[in-house]
Amino acid sequence: GKAFEKAAGVLLEKHLSLEDPEPDPRFYPPWIVRLERYVLACRLEETLSLPGASMDDLRCLAEAFSDQGITATQGMQPSTNSLITRLMEDWVCHPGDRQRMEQVAEALALIRTIGAPYPAWHLQDLFISVRDGPALKWETGARAGAEEAVAWWGSFQALGRALGVCVPGGAGHPQP
């Protein structure tokens, strides 16, 4: 439980503090590698499920996973990933906010890089609600050449591709 996770984290921090300032994870003893994987997976699960988790928290964890060469977290359920769901729902409430949309795309990329599960169908459904509603206005603006609309539409199409959702005007769906 939580007590074991905390103890594992303390043990890992203690061991790493005794190592060289720039330790090479390839030379860690196997038990440290397993402990580190466990601690990072616990921190990831906690971060993804906390209501107050931020993109900075996710970026730090993604960096730690990358530094240690760890991917493919096992045992997590997609429903525990409330961070990406919260970001997506926030963007859906403010669909014209390109910064929020790009934050969703960044979070999705980081989560995929780490190998954490996420509720793909739910995210796709939320995306489709924007595609079939508010996005139509932005598409019209993009076709007219409005600079902000063109930028928004490009980000929107990229997010659609990342989610595996067809977007009119995207690849395979030529604009009329």
Regions found by a protein language model. Give the residues of each.
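Extended alpha-helical scaffold segments
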Residues: 1-176
